[in-house]
């Protein structure tokens, strides 16, 4: 059985894609499945490495390997960027630059950015001098890259167990929050990913009869990552975005050594990265979207007490200790002062705005939360709700778009300590529209279908459609060919049962 969809027929000519990763080989973990597709669709692809990977190996070695892998993934050498910061593992005895107000010395001995293997570090290339190893300089360099490229699609690693990954993720979120607030005309598609939990430490199941989807990590079983991020904040597994794999859609075959991701991993010989290929090569690419069309970025904020800015700064949490793998999360919250009876925060939009969807995030910690939050639009209460635990979003979808000038949130009741609101998001539409058009992908049992094999004894296969930017209630038109003539149906929703006749392999698409 074979199945295709229209995702890879999109024309991205003139569009830009930026992949932000901390180390050479993370580009495969973060974007190896989708970056070749974007390049084939005409996009200009960029990869930015924040460190030189110089913890155990010379920067010259790591940079050469990165450039070779990037070329295989469709990124030209002039679009490969190295910020040039030091590679710092957890607990090296060196202060991490995330905590440094004065230049920190990396394990390699460097205290400022540098290049190698024919590549200059970004700061020297753009400003004529390197950047010191400080948090402020790192943030400035990340911001400069994002603002210079102004990519239509940005992929960045998210919070995981490695200090360098954590730093890039948190700094990137802060940079984007500031940029989106200052520039209402820039609204890229931003995708975050877990380079360890859903890639580098993925299930080694490449040789299953049919290619498997990325499996949700189970702490202690599928990954040694001690914090189950996939139950916290915006990491709701069921809300992940899944992209088909370009390699399987276009070649019609599955061969480990021929797969572009495996070939890219092999370039990272110093890391032995290809040893993880069987777990990295899955049938989908999994991301968590940070919607940038949040109306809160253009709103004026007011609070009865406390600083309202953290409720619309792009950050859902911070880091209490960059080195500790299981350290408590740092909070970046709006919280009213003790004795404030009003306990309210308001978002006033420049003009009356159409509102369809709201997502309100509380604190990610376990020590307290808001158990009753009154939500009002232009002075009219539309409901009182408890915020879910662990910073997960309270999601409210209006039955119909509503014209609104102001949204006010009032804490009616809270329990515990250190509770507050981490981020508020207001949207005019259910999905962010932009560079990628909606698509569907046929799946069965949660696995995307490509060149799908069924044993001769199997006579029935239940099919579903994964939808990107398409409502679950929207009807689907589908057509199937069982070898004896096409059969079609219209207006069907949900699962489709496919049976084949003896001796027929069958084929289907939708």
Give the residues covered by each predicted segment.
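C-terminal accessory domains and tails appended to enzymatic cores
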Residues: 2-4, 11, 92-132, 140-144, ...
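Active-site beta-strand->loop->alpha-helix modules in alpha/beta enzyme cores, enriched
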Residues: 2-185
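Surface-exposed, short loops/turns at beta-strand junctions within beta-sandwich domains
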Residues: 400-403, 495-502
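Low-complexity "stalk/linker" and mucin-like segments enriched in Ser/Thr/Pro/Ala/Gly
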Residues: 448-450, 471, 479-498
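Append "Rare intracellular matches occur via the same short Y/T/C beta-strand/loop motifs
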Residues: 501-510
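Solvent-exposed, low-complexity, repeat-rich "mucin-like" stalks and linkers
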Residues: 436-473
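Aromatic, loop-rich ligand-recognition surfaces of beta-strand-rich domains
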Residues: 326-383, 387-434
């Amino acid at each position: 059985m074979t199945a295709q969809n229209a995702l890879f027929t999109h024309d991205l000519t003139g569009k830009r894609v930026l992949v932000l990763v901390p180390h050479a080989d993370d580009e495969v973990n973060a974007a190896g499945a989708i970056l070749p597709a974007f390049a084939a669709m005409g996009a200009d692809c960029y990869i930015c490495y924040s460190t030189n990977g110089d913890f155990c190996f010379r920067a010259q070695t790591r940079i050469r390997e990165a450039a070779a892998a990037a070329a295989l993934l469709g990124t030209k050498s002039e679009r490969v960027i190295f910020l040039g910061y030091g590679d710092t593992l957890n607990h090296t005895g060196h202060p991490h630059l995330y905590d440094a107000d004065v230049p920190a010395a990396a394990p390699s001995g460097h205290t400022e950015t540098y290049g190698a293997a024919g590549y200059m570090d970004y700061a020297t290339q753009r400003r004529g001098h390197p950047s010191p190893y400080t948090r402020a300089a790192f943030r400035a360099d990340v911001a400069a890259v994002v603002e210079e490229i102004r990519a239509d699609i940005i992929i960045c690693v998210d919070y995981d167990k490695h200090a360098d990954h954590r730093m890039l993720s948190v700094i990137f979120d802060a940079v984007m929050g500031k940029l989106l607030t200052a520039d209402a005309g820039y609204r890229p598609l931003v995708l975050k990913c877990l380079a360890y939990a859903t890639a580098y430490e993925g299930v080694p199941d490449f040789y299953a009869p049919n290619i498997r989807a990325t499996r949700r990590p189970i702490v202690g079983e599928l990954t040694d990552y001690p914090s189950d991020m996939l139950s916290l904040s915006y990491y709701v597994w069921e809300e992940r975005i899944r992209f088909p794999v370009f390699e399987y859609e276009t070649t019609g075959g599955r061969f480990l050594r021929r797969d572009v991701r495996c070939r890219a991993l092999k370039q990272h010989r110093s890391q032995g990265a290809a040893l993880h290929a069987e777990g990295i090569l899955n049938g989908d690419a999994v991301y968590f979207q940070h919607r940038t069309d949040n109306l809160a970025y253009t709103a004026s904020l007011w609070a009865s007490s406390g600083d309202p800015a953290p409720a619309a700064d792009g950050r859902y949490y911070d880091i209490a200790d960059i080195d500790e793998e299981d350290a408590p999360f740092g909070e970046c919250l709006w919280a009213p002062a003790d004795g404030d009876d009003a306990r309210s925060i308001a978002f006033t939009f420049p003009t009356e705005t159409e509102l369809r969807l709201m997502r309100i995030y509380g604190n990610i910690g376990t020590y307290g939360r808001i158990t009753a939050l009154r939500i009002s639009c232009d002075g009219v209460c539309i409901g009182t709700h408890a915020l879910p635990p662990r910073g997960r979003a309270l999601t409210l979808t209006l039955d119909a778009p509503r014209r609104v000038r102001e949204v006010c949130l009032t804490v009616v009741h809270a329990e515990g300590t250190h509770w507050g609101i981490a981020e508020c998001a207001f949207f005019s539409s259910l999905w962010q529209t932009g560079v990628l058009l909606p698509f569907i992908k046929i799946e069965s049992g949660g696995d995307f279908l490509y060149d799908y094999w069924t044993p001769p004894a199997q006579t029935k296969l239940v099919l579903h459609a994964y939808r990107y930017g398409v409502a679950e209630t929207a009807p689907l038109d589908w057509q199937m060919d069982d070898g004896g003539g096409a059969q079609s149906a219209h207006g069907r929703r949900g699962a489709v049962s496919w049976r084949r006749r003896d001796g027929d392999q069958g084929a289907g698409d939708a």
